[in-house]
UniProtKB/Swiss-Prot annotation:
Glycosylation, residue list: N74, N123
Gene: cfaC
The keyword Ubl conjugation appears for this protein: no
GO cellular component: extracellular region
UniProt source species: Dictyostelium discoideum (Social amoeba)
Record keywords: Glycoprotein, Secreted, Signal
Protein name: Counting factor-associated protein C
Source organism, top-level taxon: Eukaryota
Length: 219
């Protein structure tokens, strides 16, 4: 009996060590409204989904629209919400005490402003499915030294930008959309919202110099 109990204990310990961390999935919706025009309750429409982020629980990351400061995300103990911990700007690895904590119910649509003119809408949810988004440009953060071949199993966070989706440019007030191949991405830049009329076209190679921001095209 003692041997059986010991065996079960060892199996439990091994499982806890190899079990993947929960995934926190965020969607960012960019409708282009002014910040002052938004009033709760907010609506995150799938038609406006520009991209988002996938995060391992506890990974230190930045993501425009959710936070411009170092941030970690954890699932609540009952799995009903996501807890966002924000750290000071110089706490690059989220090692000190957080300066702000926010609890977001799974699926709730939240608003955040990057400046006085453009707003972001986003929602967060806990998810055990780590399937990588398709038809998107991926920017990957990994602790691996060989992420060119193993990023799919070693990633800590993945920021993704959906291809062929019109996105409001928060800097210029215009709009843009992207397409991609394994060699890089093409950016179509428009002077006005709506992605219509005579875009300027730019070809951009992917960043592949390190595993902190490694880029690929997911088809």
């Amino acid at each position: 009996m003692k041997v059986l109990i010991l065996l079960v204990s060892l199996i439990s310990v091994c499982f806890s060590q190899i079990a993947p961390k929960p995934i926190i999935v965020g969607g960012v919706y960019r409708g282009g409204e002014t910040c002052n025009s938004l009033q709760p309750p907010y609506t995150c429409s799938s038609d406006d989904l520009a991209g988002g982020i996938m995060m391992r629980q506890g990974a230190c990351t930045y993501f425009r629209g959710l936070s411009n400061l170092p941030t970690t995300y954890n699932s609540s103990s009952d799995g009903s919400s996501v807890i966002q911990y924000t750290y000071s700007a110089d706490d690059y690895f989220c090692q000190e005490s957080p300066i702000q904590t926010q609890t977001i119910s799974n699926g709730d649509c939240e608003a955040g402003c990057s400046n006085d003119k453009i707003s972001y809408l986003y929602n967060l949810s806990s998810d055990s499915n780590d399937q990588v988004p398709k038809n998107a440009v991926l920017t990957i953060k990994s602790q691996s030294s060989n992420c060119a071949t193993d990023w799919e199993t070693t990633w800590e966070s993945i920021e993704y930008l959906n291809t062929d989706t019109c996105i409001v440019d928060e800097v210029t007030g215009g709009s843009f959309k992207v397409s991609c191949t394994q060699g890089g991405m093409t950016i179509y830049s428009y002077a006005a919202p709506g992605c219509t009329n005579n875009p300027k076209v730019y070809g951009v190679g992917f960043y592949t110099d390190s595993c902190d921001g490694y880029q690929v095209c997911s088809l």
